Amino acid sequence: MEKLVIATRASNLALWQAYHIKERIETAFPEVRVELNEITSKGDKILDKPLALVGGKGHFTKELEDEMIAGNAHLAVHSLKDVPTYIPEGLELCAITERQDQSDVFLSHTYKSLSELPEGAVVGTTSLRRRMQLLEKRPDLKVKDLRGNVNTRLRKLKEGQYDAIILAYIGLYRLDLLKDIPYVEKLDFFIPPMGQAALGIEIVANNDRIREIAMTLNHEPTFICTKVERDFISVIGAGCSAPVAVNATMDKKEDDKVPTISVRAMIGYPDGTHILHKSLTVPLNEADILGDELAQAMIEEGALDILEQAEIIAFKDEMPERL
């Protein structure tokens, strides 16, 4: 029997994702026995400050990649939103699983919705992207950093450290945690980050058998859409924790029309000001250039200056009060 080793983070959500992939592989390839190599990433260890203030990239992926390069794992399962656009030599982002619900959700034990939060209410989030979009909509709120795994964040909410918090819907759904929260509201006005709600399958590049197995996990429409998002991020030069939102979708095909793909993006300061929105739609056969085109269009409108200033704001000790 063949053995295949999956590198995974040791958090509850990461393990759910890894076991999900393990089950899919063993079902499709009964001759393969899958083992998990559980690893604690740098991002899991840094709990005293926002990752946006740490600098660098790959906080949740580098240790898994090191295990593959060292020969201790054949593939790694990542939340795609955590995977930098640069993949180390000798590795390959081979497959992307079908994307599920990308929503960000408002969670509270006291208030039914974002609109019901009073002025000055405290909202918890780790993400500069969420902070940016929240404060653009509700500049009267106070946003505080929220670290820890999903269960830790929910505990802090229940203890009353926050009036509300914002998390990704998909993690709560996968861990069956939505039933424990009285008030849940999907924030439809939020644009998600690159790759949210999809899994990235990274492999050792010179192993054709592992590639054959991994490719059975790939969902081509999701692969195309997330490539547009990753191309955009690569050209803009933003890291996974920058205040940048981008989302590509394939448009519903009408019988008499050429299929199209659309992408929308948003860049701004973490305090919800200096926001730049833009979207583009092209025929599906031009998807390979769509991310680059949108990035270049936003650069022409000042995106790089906005990102530079956003980084300065995020790193300043005397951040604005609402940060």
From Swiss-Prot:
Pfam family, one: Porphobil_deam
Gene3D superfamilies linked to this entry: Periplasmic binding protein-like II (3.40.190.10), Porphobilinogen deaminase, C-terminal domain (3.30.160.40)
GO CC, any one term: cytoplasm
EC number from the UniProt entry: 2.5.1.61
Required co-factors: dipyrromethane
InterPro entries in UniProt: HemC, Porphobilin_deaminase_cofac_BS, Porphobilin_deaminase_N, Porphobilinogen_deaminase_C, Porphobilinogen_deaminase_C_sf
Known partners and oligomeric status: Monomer.
Other information: The porphobilinogen subunits are added to the dipyrromethane group.
Family, per entry: Belongs to the HMBS family.
Protein name: Porphobilinogen deaminase
Top-level taxonomy: Bacteria, Pseudomonadati, Campylobacterota, Epsilonproteobacteria, Campylobacterales
Annotated gene: hemC
